[in-house]
Amino acid sequence: RRILHQLIRKEGVKLNNLTDIKSMTLDELTDFVTENGFPKFRAKQIYDWLYKNVTDFDDMRNISADLKTFLKSSSYISVANIEKKLVSRYDKTVKYLFSFNDGECVESVVMSYKHGYSICISTQVGCKMGCTFCATGKSGFSRSLAPSEMLGQIETAQRDLNIRISNIVLMGMGEPLDNFDNVVKFLRLVSSDNGLNIGMRHITLSTCGIVPKIYELAKLHLGITLSVSLHAP
């Protein structure tokens, strides 16, 4: 397992030079495709495959061979792999440990309610905030997650449990407002009609209270619920 982990981390270093294609909006993907000499309609085809959980460009059956070759040389598809899964014997709550392309890991939790399924996702690997009641901060901070890696936690959980998640809570590892730009982009992607289509009013963002970023978030009028921890430093 240690050898596999090292191989994944080496691959992650190489991937840093490639485009994280699943963190793109449809408009961004359209620009990416057309600027490299391919027809505009190809972007929607690629985008549809990404949200059908396809993780290999070769599996995109209606994409031309030359476009596949270009995508393989320029891009990668972020994947959240299940490293560990724990299921509560009391209420069937499921806790996941996910790993990403570079071998870094985060935790997510899926909870079942009468109204449907909710997932608590992570936004960073580790955390800088140092809240005394939180175990995450004690492990230090590694990096922030890309929008695609936040999406991946939801998609992998849905596929594994064969469910449709209807509510999202950004209350896992990390401080969402310390990863502001990526979190906002994730919110736009996850609520898009072309993506997972989970409405903003079904999303809660929990913060330890980074006040300037709270004001900045409010100006965007996203319609999400903001939860502020009263026990943060």
Predicted regions and their residues:
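Basic polycationic patches enriched in arginine
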Residues: 1-2, 9
